[in-house]
Amino acid sequence: PYRFIRSGRVNPGAYPLNMTRKERKMKWNPEEYKEWWTPKWYEAIAKGMFVKRDLKDGQMSRDMTLFVDDDGKAYHIYSSEENLTLHIAELTDDYLQHSGRYIRIFPGGHNEAPALFKKDNMYWMITSGCTGWDPNEARMFSASSIWGPWKQHPNPCRGQNSEKTFGGQSTFVLELPENRFIFMADVWKPKSLMYSGHIWLPIQFDEQGVPFIEWTDEVNLSAQSEWKLVWSDEFNTDGLPDTTVWSYDNGFARNEEAQWYQKGNAY
């Protein structure tokens, strides 16, 4: 059975690693910023007004996910600062506490529902905007280090209804064998939450290695679904294929059938 350990806010007394010395020394009078969404208010948010407000007792943590890196380090990614700014916070080696190391991502960007994954030493994160139960356009960010700097990309979704993330909201990215990834999204039904559901869609990558997501009515999670057979003109010969390029096998079913294959061409 699960055992309750504790509850609490995140990293009390600790400043974000990417908050400047000048920002850490700034003082804010909340009475001057009662009106939200003004340019003056946005500037204060970007410079860490809410971080300073919550510094003593710890940062707000909501709409979150967890990510474990290749080296076993775990990270808590969550919406903070009144749901206005994402934080990435490192956990201790036993995963039971925060280490005190964390960063802010796009302060005031109003991102939530983070889903993080890593491919070819690049970190990718898909999020949503904050529109309550209603779906909205997905956002995507990347960084070569989990500590940033993070770069924003266009909506990763393509095709019909992509501006609404196909009716869903990002929740997790599932990594499969052979460097394949599944984008998972919640489909909320606020009038009757018991009928809420999920979307699972394969993440594809363009020639530059940038992820994108297209709608498909059916997803085959079998590794064999990724196999491809590519014809080579080298087979157009009266004799045997070029043995300096092609390898030979007697067949996987021990039927002595000659099988020729080329690494990287037929797999």
Question: What label would you give each PLM region?
Answer:
Residues 1-267:
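Carbohydrate-active catalytic/glycan-binding domains of CAZyme proteins
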